From Swiss-Prot:
Main function: Transfers the gamma-phosphate of ATP to the 4'-position of a tetraacyldisaccharide 1-phosphate intermediate (termed DS-1-P) to form tetraacyldisaccharide 1,4'-bis-phosphate (lipid IVA).
GO molecular function: ATP binding; tetraacyldisaccharide 4'-kinase activity
Reactions listed under catalytic activity: a lipid A disaccharide + ATP = a lipid IVA + ADP + H(+)
Name of the encoding gene: lpxK
Residues bound to ATP: 55-62
Native species: Salmonella paratyphi C (strain RKS4594)
Pathway(s): Glycolipid biosynthesis; lipid IV(A) biosynthesis; lipid IV(A) from (3R)-3-hydroxytetradecanoyl-[acyl-carrier-protein] and UDP-N-acetyl-alpha-D-glucosamine: step 6/6
Listed name of the protein: Tetraacyldisaccharide 4'-kinase
Coiled-coil residue spans: none
Family stated for the protein in its record: Belongs to the LpxK family.
Entry's EC annotation: 2.7.1.130
GO biological process, one term: lipopolysaccharide core region biosynthetic process
Sorted UniProt keywords: ATP-binding, Kinase, Lipid A biosynthesis, Lipid biosynthesis, Lipid metabolism, Nucleotide-binding, Transferase
Amino acid sequence: MIARIWSGESPLWRLLLPLSWLYGLVSGAIRLSYKLGFKRAWRAPVPVVVVGNLTAGGNGKTPVVIWLVEKLQQRGVRVGVVSRGYGGKAAAYPLLLTPETTTAEAGDEPVLIYQRTGAPVAVAPERAAAVKAILAAHNVQIIITDDGLQHYRLARDIEIVVIDGVRRFGNGWWLPAGPMRERASRLKTVDAAIVNGGVARAGEIPMQLAPGLAVNLRTGARCDVAQLSNIVAMAGIGHPPRFFATLEACGAHPQKCVPLADHQTLAPADVQALVGEGQTLVMTEKDAVKCRAFAEDNWWFLPVDARLSGEQPDKLLEHITSLVR
């Protein structure tokens, strides 16, 4: 229903317009207060790059963060990552991730980024506190903030927006009548717009999510996902249909697709109940970090990597590395 309202297919969005006007007024006032100097943002002693969204819902932001961290690491840059840690609840903040940190403490996306990149990761509702925690423990040269485009309390040097190339901005209205956190005109002020799927427009960087080999949660064995049989697909991400479509494109045709809420807590019994005898469970990598501790032999995940095309990605990386002292 939310998807139909935000796309404009359902006329119910009109009923929510008063709330959207209020949301837009408040969010605009917050940004203006920092722009005019009534409120002050904290500036880190190292460059800060924000990777965020203009819309609610999954746009492919986390794969972009991983891509950016890995590309900078390949260039010899020491990178730290901060996040709000949505979906997790730590005993105290800021929380600096370790190999023992769970998704219940830090949230699924920070744990995934930490495991994939090995970069220092810290979470805190106040992102400046997370940055300070990393700087106190690690000699990093740059900070990437996973989400937080609208978190103006943290000053930033580079802003990158990730856009769903198929859904783009829906009906264009602020939450809750539409998907917008800020209006599309905000694109004029960011340093780069990366478009996940669909057709990129002038000035935008095209991106595709490229699936790798399926990985067994228990053994680490790898195989082509099309070789798995009797698949039950599970996706607890911002836009589950994208994952199911990826499986189909890989030649894996699920018998059943189970969409879950983004950042949903997964109980062992609930996940086990999804799979019958002779079936294979295939999930996203983000779900896998939550399920690995209680995984069964027939559970697999399909990792995806961001692939950015054209000359713009290299120019963006050059611009970012030029800020590193």
